[in-house]
Curated annotation (Swiss-Prot):
Residues 352-418 form the S4 RNA-binding domain. ATP binds at K233. The gene is tyrS1. InterPro entries: aa-tRNA-synth_I_CS, aa-tRNA-synth_Ic, Rossmann-like_a/b/a_fold, S4_RNA-bd, S4_RNA-bd_sf, SYY-like_C, Tyr-tRNA-ligase, Tyr-tRNA-ligase_bac-type. Gene3D superfamilies: HUPs, RNA-binding S4 domain, Tyrosyl-Transfer RNA Synthetase. This is Tyrosine--tRNA ligase 1. It comes from the Bacteria. GO terms for cellular component: cytosol. It comes from Bacillus cereus (strain ATCC 14579 / DSM 31 / CCUG 7414 / JCM 2152 / NBRC 15305 / NCIMB 9373 / NCTC 2599 / NRRL B-3711).
């Protein structure tokens, strides 16, 4: 099965140019393709993973991806999908973000020891040295104002306002494609559905600049959720690929909590499971949704891909411990992950009567309530029900000398830090 047939099965083609010529090109030779990533933060998030994994799919099919980091365009700001002007970052900030993103991209693509190695590029290398006269004379003259105003990325901002800075973004991205076409023989640009206008503008610039040019564009569909909320966001914010921003446990939980209505679609979009494996999981969703086999497969595949096998095993262990209440089996680092958002209090490492600990840590509102909680069996210390009113929390209750986990009731956890 060819790459296009695989993408069609997965629902990964939104729009593409010249279907027949594009398919023939992919069948005939190893094609260089690119996708751009503007450094707007010091980490990629799962929304970025979608096109990154497209580059990976093409590489696995024998093609040569170029991961383009927008060190230049990142200082301008892409108006696509934005209702208001972006806040511009400083040159130093963009440079820092660029390096961070380059490091993350290297985790998903093979840059050496393969016949079709990926390439990393930074558009600041050519945009940073571009003078205004050359830009307007050699590039700008190829873009008619009416043509640009008709593009969705610009048209959608005309009423609310768009600066010349963001208005020029389309031209800069088009120049990226031309530069990569001329110097790297890059024939294909891929991007999100909101990039169609920028991609076709780049194709038009190549057509005007290069005789008999053959270049192509492909966009992937917007990732949606059946409940109408935005994909990739939680109450805690974006789901990042950096484990310091989003722990592997949180990352795993994000995928595990996928709605039954979305899980098969996400298996197709994000994983590298075979068609047969996905169809089998789809069958299990229909026949036994309560087993959540598809969600477990999705969480495992994505966490392993981004954070590795060891982090996946940790995430599964933390999830199982929280579900069963067997939290004493967790290490300190696993507790840090699993209890990141749990109410916590700092205490000195001294022996303390449990009743006093409950009140002083505001786990129980009063001593009377604390006594009731203990005698009623509502208090657990490191997963063990504790009903003795004279129980003293000692060194033996401090996991690795750092934590004591108190549970009140079925699911209300509190973390004591030492």
């Amino acid at each position: 099965m060819g790459i296009l047939q695989d993408l069609e099965f997965r629902g990964l083609i939104n729009q593409q140019t010249d279907d027949e010529g594009f398919e023939q090109l992919l069948e005939k030779e190893s094609v260089k393709l690119y996708c751009g990533f503007d450094p707007t933060a010091d980490s990629l998030h799962i929304g970025h993973m979608y096109p990154v994994l497209m580059l990976r799919r093409f590489q696995l099919a024998g093609h040569q991806p170029i991961a383009l980091v927008g060190g230049g365009t990142g200082m301008i700001g892409d108006p696509s999908g934005k209702k208001a002007e972006r806040t511009l970052n400083t040159k130093d900030t963009v440079a820092y973000y660029t390096e961070s993103i380059k490091n993350q991209l290297s985790n998903f693509l093979e840059f050496e020891n393969v016949d079709n190695p990926a390439t990393m590029a930074n558009n600041y290398d050519w945009l940073g040295n571009l003078d205004v006269i050359s830009f307007l004379r050699d590039i700008g003259k190829n873009f008619g104002l009416n043509y640009m105003l008709a593009k969705d990325t610009v048209a959608s901002r005309l009423e609310t306002g768009i600066s010349f800075t963001e208005f020029s973004y389309m031209i800069l991205q088009s120049y990226d494609f031309l530069n990569l076409y001329q110097h790297h023989k890059c024939r294909l640009q891929i991007g999100g559905s909101d990039q169609w206008g920028n991609i076709t503008a780049g194709l038009e610039l190549i057509r005007k600049s290069e005789e008999d040019a053959k270049a192509f564009g492909l966009t992937i569909p917007l990732v949606t959720k059946s409940d109408g909320t935005k994909f990739g966001k939680t109450e805690g914010g974006a789901i990042w690929l950096d484990p310091e921003k989003t722990t592997p446990y949180e990352f795993y939980q994000f995928w595990i909590n996928t709605d039954d209505r979305d899980v098969v679609k996400y298996l197709k979009y994000f994983t590298f499971l075979s068609h047969e494996e996905i169809l089998e999981l789809e069958k299990q969703v229909a026949e036994a949704p309560e087993k959540r086999a598809a969600q477990k497969a999705l969480g495992s595949e994505m966490t392993k891909l981004v954070h590795g096998e060891e982090a996946l095993e940790q995430a599964i262990k933390i999830s199982a411990a929280l579900f069963s209440g067997s939290v004493a089996e967790l290490t300190a680092s696993e507790i840090e992950q699993g209890f990141k958002d749990v109410p916590s209090v700092e205490r000195t490492a001294e022996d303390t009567v449990l009743i006093d600990l409950l009140v002083e840590s505001k786990i129980s509102p009063s001593k009377r309530q604390a006594r009731e909680d203990v005698t009623n069996g509502a208090i657990y210390v490191n997963g063990e029900r504790t009903q003795a009113l004279d129980y003293v929390v000692t060194e033996n209750d401090r996991i690795e000398g750092k934590f004591t986990i108190i549970r009140r009731g079925k699911k209300k956890y509190f973390l004591i830090r030492y």
